[in-house]
């Protein structure tokens, strides 16, 4: 075998071995992450919204502590409504959308799982972009502040 071909084949094998260790990511959550990145200030990362207030991140309880936390509260409830659509899992549902001119356009028939989930994510991402991020509300003691 040609040494150049062997080198390329080895590089491909090493790349595939590395890729096999990357956990799969829910497509919808990836799409939501892209929407968030599009709407938030440049100095923030989408991950800074994953453990904020009482509702941004896994679970949620109590009263939202500010406008940004209310965005997450509304998003959680929207996902709850979407889950009532037959065979709809909002966390894994993919959808079609376009990021354009500082807004987000969702495609698909109204009332379908894909469109409802896209609209949930769109509304939340735009809300994030219009809400103040308060550093002191990141990683709060939810047992104390979210009753």
Swiss-Prot record:
Q: Which Pfam families match?
A: Phospholip_A2_1
User: What GO terms in the biological process aspect are recorded for it?
Assistant: arachidonate secretion; lipid catabolic process; phospholipid metabolic process
The protein's required cofactor(s) are namely:
Ca(2+)
Location in the cell: Secreted
Q: What does the record give as EC number?
A: 3.1.1.4
Q: Which residues form the propeptide?
A: 20-27
Task: Report the catalytic activity.
Answer: a 1,2-diacyl-sn-glycero-3-phosphocholine + H2O = a 1-acyl-sn-glycero-3-phosphocholine + a fatty acid + H(+)
- Which positions are catalytic residues? 75, 121
Bound cofactor: record note: Binds 1 Ca(2+) ion.
Instruction: State the InterPro entries in the record.
Output: PLipase_A2, PLipase_A2_Asp_AS, PLipase_A2_dom, PLipase_A2_dom_sf, PLipase_A2_His_AS
Sites binding Ca(2+) sit at: 55, 57, 59, 76
Alphabetically, the GO molecular function entries are:
calcium ion binding; calcium-dependent phospholipase A2 activity; phospholipid binding; toxin activity
> From which residue to which does the signal peptide run?
1-19
The record's account of tissue expression is:
Expressed by the venom gland.
Q: What's the domain of life for this entry?
A: Eukaryota
Which EC class is the enzyme in? Answer: hydrolase
- Which Cys-Cys disulfides exist here? 54-146, 56-72, 71-127, 78-120, 88-113, 106-118
What the record says about family reads:
Belongs to the phospholipase A2 family. Group I subfamily. D49 sub-subfamily.
Q: How does it assemble?
A: Heterodimer; disulfide-linked. The A chains have phospholipase A2 activity and the B chains show homology with the basic protease inhibitors.
| Name of the protein described by the UniProt record | Acidic phospholipase A2 beta-bungarotoxin A4 chain
